[in-house]
């Protein structure tokens, strides 16, 4: 092989990623077969989980789909999981894939309405503490009845629009068609300080909203995918689910909102950044300009979007169909009644979610490895061997730790299945089963905010287009989530252990 061709292969491998990153991924790929041969499949599988988490942590160096995809492809070739096991995981999580394909695209077609509403909220509320509290509370309320990924997609769409508006003005590219908000090369030094402050401002709002989706999502039957699973196994309907979980979810919700206020007041952990006056002026002028340009056709489109949002909320609340199918309904309604019929224009709506959908398939391959190698089985057995009064608290901790590194739907599935089998075998009372079901639900929802891979909404935020724009890395997300993790995890454990 010629030297120029070798260099070309080296440069093409993982694109513009740093050289050390490329070498690290190659080292992973070369060492895994050796590790499987020397240490066995269990050790190799745990190492694979760690390697995949590394690719997520380095998401700003390289999108995790490529390095993570290579790792899971190797895992399938080495026999750590079978293609059939991966397919079974995808079938089990098909509603989540449907949601990503269609619901996120549906939200894209509602962005004009959302931008109007959120711009009025952002420009109308001067207090950053109150604004943060509203973002967190609204995200919690919406996630209790919608889906956390849907709510996160809304907030991301708004943040991207706001950032692009100011960045375009700051870089003097108001009318440029090939404008790229990802680079600051055209931003003069005069505006850079304001731009960095605006980035910090948006980062804090995004994190408050993301945590809010977890605070609200734990409360109801439809808040998170695993809630439906647990509710089905326990035989709880909507009201009964809320009542059973309330002794844990309500105190944690209150504590989470107080934490939001405390973080903004203390300006710790990356919070407390204010909206610069110059940025507020630009956004206000943009909002006023958009309002002046809004003619009858645009107003009619906003009305259609509002009606579609109403249909969306009713459909989700009544669960008339899978969430993704309701998203497809929204796409059809809005595009049909606002005149969006161009194929390329429709295609742009899917650009945000489909890369993440592909990444989630790779993530489910890791879950298949965990499942097929029984990595969590010893932990489950150890918890269920404890005295009955200690089981809820330990289940909460075990769920939280495992959900922080794996898929919380998978963790909840494993635990609730084991506990239901113990109930059916007569090893526990129905009352104790209900207590353990609440521990599993809250354990998979609350402490899992510790890492982006613990919550699908957090992972979606990390790998979305807004993350590089506002410099929101894996490490920064972990750091900013830390106070919430300690409060929600600590109080959640105490409530599960003493208040159920």
Swiss-Prot record:
Keywords assigned by UniProt, alphabetized = Antiport, Cell inner membrane, Cell membrane, Ion transport, Membrane, Sodium, Sodium transport, Transmembrane, Transmembrane helix, Transport
Entry keyword annotation includes Membrane: yes
Membrane topology according to the record: Multi-pass membrane protein
Q: Which Pfam families match?
A: NhaB (PF06450)
Q: Name one GO molecular function term.
A: sodium:proton antiporter activity
Q: What is its main location?
A: membrane
GO CC terms for this protein?
A: plasma membrane
Write out the similarity annotation. Belongs to the NhaB Na(+)/H(+) (TC 2.A.34) antiporter family.
> This protein is called what?
Na(+)/H(+) antiporter NhaB
Q: From what organism does this protein derive?
A: Pseudomonas paraeruginosa (strain DSM 24068 / PA7)
This chain is encoded by the gene named nhaB
